[in-house]
A protein has these predicted regions:
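Aromatic-lined carbohydrate-binding surfaces of glycoside hydrolases
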Residues: 3-270, 274-278, 282-285, 289-317, ...
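Histidine-centered catalytic/metal-binding microenvironments
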Residues: 394-503
Length: 503
């Protein structure tokens, strides 16, 4: 596949990012995506130690962040990686913000810029205080001009960007409700703005490829507008709300999807609903495209063995040819390697050679990782995965699920028992990985215990156990930093799964 990439997410030190970039081409990836105009927020999360008060925060100045951005690009260029940039943040720039993350603004939109913002809930202001999540009034000509001028200026100043992602605001049910905007759809407006952007880039003599996004409201295909110059653009299908308890099918027929109602959208959870939206878009755009998916962005924390999510990734990638796309980019934490890095390994290998059986990848990876006795490690991780539920972790379905509580109790017992059977390996690399698996058993016992009470409807005890889990991983983070993103697991657990933020 032409597109084999990873997008920066989570909380990251500069060393984390540089190590990951070094690893990418060695494993068959060819692209890396730096979100926002500058990827400030991902560095800020780590150096401020957000969600881990046991570590002392480090202040970053603008010059520090700029130096990190340059260092990352130099590392990419050295290895010949395709450079993707920006995505969200353009709308924030029009409204007077830097557009370098999902930061909460301490003020309202400046009065002179307020008419450019979407009218939502009877007012034109930052959506829930976050500029990057704030749409514009796309029927406003000045808003369209400023938005596209900003992209052209960035493309001119950043010739290193092979692909520039032009997305609207993040979040959903936050589009403009003014009379003019309601005469059309946000997807039609998006396509017209893409055409305007192409005209401006052409006049400026800029060859930059533009990636456009099928995501949330924009999953719905336009009703009238069409892209006039397909060669400029690359379609990116981003089914962020999909289930990860199943994979994309090799044989697919569209299904009925709910009609779009402005600012009353229910995000589609089934694979079939999401793919039906993709098929509708492909009727109006037949150019280059790739899947932008999230197995290692949130759902993976719900798979305590990482074996089920690895299999989903493998099968998803083998289904890409069914949908006529040219690759895959993973929106993920870079430190998604707890208990193992097997899912990322599977992703890379499947994208470069689809002939390799999953079982061959498994045996090669784990025999190298654990040495003698690796089969026991695999059997344990597979049992954890079989009992885990990524949908529950991602807040799909009710929180009260007694049958699931039984599975979490079983997980706790499995982890407790397996700790007694961890061998003392001969080689240091094997010993380190077995020791990490011992850590993961303790991690699993604490988290599964909290999930067991949550799925029984006992919120108070669930939160108490979750706080114990957080205390444990916060204390352990200095030793586990390269493999476990403490910031992100706590953020997802409290934003989606249903736990309360611990002290």
């Amino acid at each position: 596949y032409a597109h084999r990439g990873v997008c920066l997410e989570g909380a990251d030190s500069l060393e984390n990012v540089l190590d990951f970039i070094d690893w990418l081409p060695k494993n068959g990836f060819n692209a890396f995506f730096l979100q926002f105009k500058k990827p400030d927020i991902f560095f800020e999360r780590w150096y401020s130690h957000e969600n881990n008060p046991t570590l002392s925060p480090e202040r970053l100045e603008r010059r520090d962040l700029d130096a990190m951005d340059r260092a990352v690009y130099r590392a990419m260029a050295l290895r010949g990686l395709v450079c993707h940039r920006v995505g969200h943040g353009w709308t924030a720039g029009v409204l007077g913000d830097t557009g370098t993350g999902w930061h909460v603004s301490g003020s309202s939109i400046p009065a002179e810029l307020a008419p450019l913002a979407a009218l939502v809930g009877g007012k034109r202001d930052y959506w829930k205080g976050i500029p990057a999540n704030t749409n514009l009034c796309y029927s406003n000509e000045q808003a369209r001009e400023l938005l596209t001028d900003q992209v052209v200026d960035y493309a001119r100043q950043h010739p290193e960007a092979d692909y520039l992602h032009f997305w609207l605001a993040d979040e959903y049910n936050n589009v403009c409700t003014c009379e003019s905007c309601q005469k059309t759809t946000v997807s039609d407006q998006y396509v017209e703005i893409l055409n305007l952007l192409d005209e401006k880039l052409t006049r400026a003599g800029l060859p930059t490829k533009i990636v456009f996004l099928l995501y949330q409201e924009l999953l719905y295909a336009p009703k009238k507008a069409a892209i006039r110059n397909p060669e400029r653009f690359c379609l990116m299908f981003a089914p962020i709300s999909r289930t990860f308890e199943g994979s994309y099918p090799l044989d697919f027929r569209p299904v009925e999807v709910a009609p779009y109602v402005r600012n009353q959208m229910r995000l589609p959870e089934t694979v079939e609903e999401n793919l039906t939206h993709l098929k509708a878009w492909q009727k109006v755009f037949s150019g280059d495209g790739f899947f932008y998916d999230y197995p290692l962005g949130r759902a993976h924390y719900g798979d305590l063995g990482y074996m089920k999510i690895a299999r989903v990734i493998y099968d998803d990638i083998h289904a890409l040819k069914t949908f006529g796309v040219n690759g895959y980019m993973s929106c993920q934490e870079l430190r998604a390697m707890s208990p193992t890095g097997f899912p990322d390994y599977v992703m890379a290998q499947a994208l470069t050679d689809e002939r390799i059986p999953f079982e061959a990848l498994r045996d090669t990876y784990f025999s190298a990782m654990f040495g003698p006795g690796w089969e026991e490690a695999v059997a344990f991780l597979e049992r954890l995965s079989a009992l885990s539920d990524t949908d529950y972790w991602n807040n799909h379905g009710p929180r009260f699920q007694p049958a699931l509580a039984d599975r979490y109790r079983h997980i706790t017992l499995l982890a407790e028992e397996f700790r007694t059977r961890i061998p003392l390996a001969q080689k240091e690399v094997w010993r380190k990985n077995w020791e990490y698996l011992d850590f993961h058993c303790r991690y699993t016992m604490l988290l599964a215990g909290a999930l067991e009470r949550l799925s029984m409807g006992d919120q108070e005890e669930a939160d108490r156990r979750f706080e114990n889990f957080c205390d444990f991983i916060r204390r352990e983070e200095p030793q586990r930093q390269s493999r476990l993103d403490v910031y992100r697991v706590i953020e997802v657990a409290t934003k989606y799964t249903g736990f309360s933020m611990p002290r």
